[in-house]
Structures are given as structure tokens and as C-alpha cells.
Amino acid sequence: MIIYLTVGDQPSGVFNSQVIDFVNFLAASTSQKVKLVAFISIRGFFSNRRQIQKKCPNAFVLPMLPRIKNWEKNKYLFFASLKLLGLKPSLIMGRNVLATLIALEAKHKGLTNKVLFDGRGAISAEWKEYRVVEDGFLEENIQQWERKAVLEADWRIAVSNKLVDFWNTSFHYKPGNETVIPCTLDQSYERIELSDTQVQAAKERIGLAPDKITLVYSGSTAGWQSGSLLRLLLEELLENQTTLQVLFLSEETATIQSLAAKYPGRIKSRLLPPNEVASFLCGCDYGLLVREQTITNQVAAPVKFAEYLACGLKVLISPNLGDYSELVEKEALGYLSTALPPQLEKMSLTDKTRIQQFALQHFIKQNYLPDYLEIIKQTT
């Protein structure tokens, strides 16, 4: 049996695609019994638990102790739950650092045989660069905790080769016992049909001008999304090319309001539930992925990149964004934000289809099944 353990991850579009979808895929595609154990905030606990169990019926959802600084104490409820339910997993996969540390202690107590660290980013750098937590004790200890997770796990998944490089330079990790698997698509993105009719219908639903070239930003307004850099890029593009319009699929911010006032009729914004985003992305031409030059971003593998491609969009991307900036140049998947052409061209259906096919070849979970099977072989 395999347990996939999360600590502090709340239900969201990312949770659906990177946790629930993964657990369901692994259970359906291998001979292993796979169980999600998720510690979530007590705030909205019951509705969030229902939301998780609706999509992953056998998930075991537990309330976290209040305040992230008490994360380690959740291990007692986890250990007790394993014993009460009679579970003895051969492998615990820990999503990120804190879950992996709890899994390592479970191994020390004989409650599991092996531990896998599912590394989603450079967590110590992220906490420092973006003040993810505001607690001195956590900030002081996260680097040594991350080192322990990286070095003591039996196997590791990294979302990018750049993340493995970070482990090597920061923690003296010797590469060899890891598998690089990028953030993969939610299964709903595997079934998108592209046609001229569908693209036109998507533009009409959002009220976009059909004759203009559409840039889209889809995602959160978190600090690492680098809103100020995005604004500078958009102002330059909108000034230089009057045939451009911009769609924001996010919460409306002061930046969006300011751009809308400065460029009347060329800025649209909508906040959509995750299951509706793809149908609007299909009507666009270029996805925006602009990030600061921080360690957090240099090792990242944002799933938004794969989602843009799956909807047939080229990507305007910052340099040094994980493994993806080089990939964009190599495979003609868009442009670096620092090396744009004089004028952006409207995407043809042929080009959209080519890019979508690239996404389906590189970012669906099924394509990484041999890697997952090898991981299971190495750890169970």
C-alpha cells in the first residue's frame, strides 16, 4: 500500500490536478492500493473534506492543529490513525517538506518501509523570498528541514532538473536517486477539442474582439507571480501593437483596474471556477508567464505552462523559469519576454494544434507511468 501525505494543502485547482488526480491515476494505473491522507485547516474543515472526498472517495482527511508552527504535532494523529485503521504502507509519499518529515518519523517508528520526497519547489528559498510564513522559528528551521527531507528520503521526485541542481548546491545532494517529473495536467485538459468554431465561441463568451490578438494571464495574484513585471511587459506590448487585447482570468486587482482605465476596451477580467478555465483559454493566442529572477522561480515548473500549451497557446515566458524557458526556445512554443518579435501574430489553428499535441506528449500523467512504475519498484 502507498500513502500520499499532504500537510497544509487546501482544496484548489492545483490540489485537484497535482494531488487528487495523481492519487486516482496511480491507483487506477498500478497494482498498488493508494490512499490520500490530507491534513487541512480546521477553518472550513467539513466543507473542504466533502470537496476532497467527492473527487477522491477513499481519502482520509484530518484536521490540522491551528497555526503552521504546530505542524510537527500533527504526526501524533497521523501515527494513531495508521494504527487504528490497521494501515502499514510500504511507501509514504510526502508532498513537500513538512509531510516528508512526518513520513520519515513514521519510518523511524516502523510504520512504513520507505519514504519518497515529492519536491514541488525550493521551499526554503520560497519562504525566505516571499515571506510565505511570518514566524521566526519556522523561517530559521526550514532550510535544515528541507535538507533532511532531501537527504534522508529513500527516493525523490523533482519537478525540474533545476530543482535537482538546487538540492545539489544547497544540500550537497548527489543526483541519482530521483526522478524528474514536471507538474502534469488535470485530466480535463487531455480532452480539449480545438476548432475554429470553438475558438470563436470562446471569444464571444468572454466578450473579446474576434479580430484582435488575445494575451491571457490565468492564475493567482501571489507574490511570486510578479505582478509589477507583468504590468511593465503589458504596457510595452499594448503601446507598440494596437491589435492586442488582454484577458485576466484571476481576481481583479488594482493593477488590472489601472490597465483597464489606461487601455479602454482592451482589458477584460473574469474569475472562473477551475473547471471552466480551459474553455476560455482556447479562445486566446498567447499565455503570460512572467516571473522575477528568484530561486523560487528558477527551479519552478508551473502547471499553468502545461495548461496554456494544452489549450493551443504559445507562451510569453521570463528567462530562467525552471526548465521551461529553454524548452520554449528549443521547440518554438512561444517567446522569451526579453526577446519578443516586433509584432505578435495571431495563432492559426494549425499552430494551435501543433502546440496542443506537444503538451499531450509531455505533460499528461500517462506518459510518466513507466517512471512511476520504476519508482514503485525502487521503493516497495
Language-model regions: role of each:
Residues V7, P63-M64, L116-R147, D165, ...:
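Acceptor-binding helix/loop patch of EC 2.4 sugar-transfer enzymes
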Residues S250, A254-L281, Y286:
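Nucleotide-activated donor-binding/catalytic signature segment of Leloir-type glycosyltransferases, i.e.
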Residues M1-R49, L232-Q241:
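N-terminal subdomain of nucleotide-sugar transferases
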Residues A339-T379:
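A charged, aromatic-enriched C-terminal amphipathic alpha-helix characteristic of glycosyltransferases
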